[in-house]
């Protein structure tokens, strides 16, 4: 991991100095070239553009020019991606210094957090199972230089370290293959994180889940040789200003069950079907470090979805935690079954708001692509807060309709409902299914099936699991206010 520090001046011994350069306006004095000269090098100051120059006279540190675009267009989202480009350009150096946190007007706290996140997340790689680690970044030290706003930069740095560490933790879990991360092992990791983060942790085994009436989680697990686990985590700060419940889908590997998935590239990515639970666990682990004042309870619903002689079958009927019965029409619509039990348990505690996060539907991926997640909700106040968090974190959300006329698509002749609504409006019918288990609780469903992984390195994202939703949930909990019970 890269270490960050704050200084009022550039350290004497540093391998590279990252100099922010805007697309117009004055050139920083340390560059030593005018715009015409920079243009001959192909450097125009476009956002995320980089150009390496040799050390200035009498100096040893190389200079890395970093384009930040037009200053009027700068925000934390741009800054995060710009910092990520700087990190990749400087990955061969052991140490760098930069004044990047100070390029925006106003407080340097949020810009610094974005810079730290961009650098840390761009450099992160999951290589636990690789013998050849030669391609890893050599950058171990980053000095954030600020002569006047040292306290703000220090505060933003600490926040950025906490949030980026959480994201890296969630990425590592989601990138780990199912041969190395079962529901039981994930629960053990959750307990360890809880102990290190001041959380209360309770792990429920299969027998306990049966006794609790968690028919969704137990039913999905029926085809697996690995038993299920439900992990309850509780963060209880003094003088809490509200109570939030988070529920994460933790399907450690999703074969589709009897409704077997095709053997294509997407099937191979189904180790990431626990990305929701990974994001929730990582979020919980960051709350104390960030001194969040909201009380947060989390449920991690963990199991495989496998085919076997004992697996869930089409036509089977499950009884869920809240007593509702569900007829199975597709065993690959399993995520909603395990979330339903978690939502039922969460609603019983009467929280001020409840959020579930899941890689739930291909329909949402088809509608929104890989750059944003869908949000469906029964409460506009919760959506508004999530959208504000989305804007601050650049984890994009788009609200899809919870259109109640489509509830009839879930009707069953033999049970209260069935687990799939047909070929159309799949993201909406999945959310309508979940809505049956939240009661009157203000609730939102985050469908992260699209942005769960990245195809390549771009901005703060790296190829592989993205841990999408982690920073968003942290920000939501940190800034939470009680919404109205009305829609």
What are these regions (language model features)?
Residues 1-250:
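Short amphipathic alpha-helical segment within the helicase RecA-like ATPase core
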Residues 48, 187-487:
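A generic structural signal for tightly packed, nonpolar segments enriched in small/aliphatic residues
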């Amino acid at each position: 991991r890269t270490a960050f520090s704050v200084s009022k001046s550039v350290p004497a011994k540093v391998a590279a100095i990252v100099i922010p350069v805007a697309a117009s306006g004055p050139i920083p004095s340390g560059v030593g070239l005018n715009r015409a000269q920079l243009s001959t090098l192909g450097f125009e100051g476009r956002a995320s553009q980089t150009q390496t120059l040799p050390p200035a006279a009498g100096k040893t540190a190389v200079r890395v020019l970093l384009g930040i675009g037009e200053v009027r267009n700068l925000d934390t989202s741009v800054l995060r991606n710009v910092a990520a480009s700087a990190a990749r350009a400087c990955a061969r150096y052991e140490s760098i210094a930069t004044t990047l946190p100070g390029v925006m007007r106003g407080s340097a706290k949020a810009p610094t957090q974005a810079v730290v996140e961009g650098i840390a997340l761009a450099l992160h790689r999951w290589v636990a199972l690789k013998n050849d680690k030669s391609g890893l970044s050599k950058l171990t030290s980053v000095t954030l230089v600020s002569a006047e706003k040292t306290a703000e930069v220090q505060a933003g740095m600490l926040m950025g370290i906490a949030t980026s560490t959480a994201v890296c933790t969630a990425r590592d879990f989601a990138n780990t293959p199912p041969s190395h991360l079962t529901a039981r092992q994930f629960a053990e990791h959750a307990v360890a994180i809880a102990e290190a983060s001041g959380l209360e942790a309770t792990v429920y085994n299969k027998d306990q889940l049966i006794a609790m009436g968690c028919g969704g989680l137990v039913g999905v697990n029926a085809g697996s040789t690995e038993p299920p686990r439900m992990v309850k985590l509780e963060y209880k700060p003094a003088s809490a200003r509200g109570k939030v419940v988070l529920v994460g889908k933790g399907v450690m590997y999703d074969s589709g069950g009897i409704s077997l998935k095709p053997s294509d590239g997407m099937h191979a990515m189904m180790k990431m079907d626990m990305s929701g639970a990974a994001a929730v666990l990582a979020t919980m682990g960051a709350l104390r470090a960030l001194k969040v004042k909201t009380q947060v309870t989390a449920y991690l619903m963990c199991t495989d979805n496998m085919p076997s002689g004992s697996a869930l079958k089409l036509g089977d009927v499950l009884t869920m935690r809240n007593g509702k019965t569900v007829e199975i029409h597709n065993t690959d619509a399993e995520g909603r079954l395990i979330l339903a039990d978690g939502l039922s348990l969460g609603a019983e505690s009467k929280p001020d708001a409840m959020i579930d996060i899941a890689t739930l539907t291909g329909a949402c991926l088809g509608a929104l692509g890989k750059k944003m997640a869908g949000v469906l909700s029964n409460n506009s106040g919760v959506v508004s807060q999530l959208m504000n968090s989305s804007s601050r974190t650049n984890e994009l959300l788009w609200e899809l309709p919870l259109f109640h006329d489509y509830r009839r698509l879930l009707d069953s002749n033999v049970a209260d409902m069935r687990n799939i609504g047909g070929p159309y409006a799949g993201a909406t019918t999945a959310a309508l299914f979940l809505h049956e288990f939240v009661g009157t609780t203000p609730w939102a469903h985050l469908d992260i099936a699209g942005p769960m992984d990245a195809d390549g390195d771009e901005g703060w994202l790296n190829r592989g699991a993205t841990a999408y939703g982690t920073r968003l949930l942290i920000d939501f909990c940190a800034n939470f206010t009680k919404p109205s019970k009305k829609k």
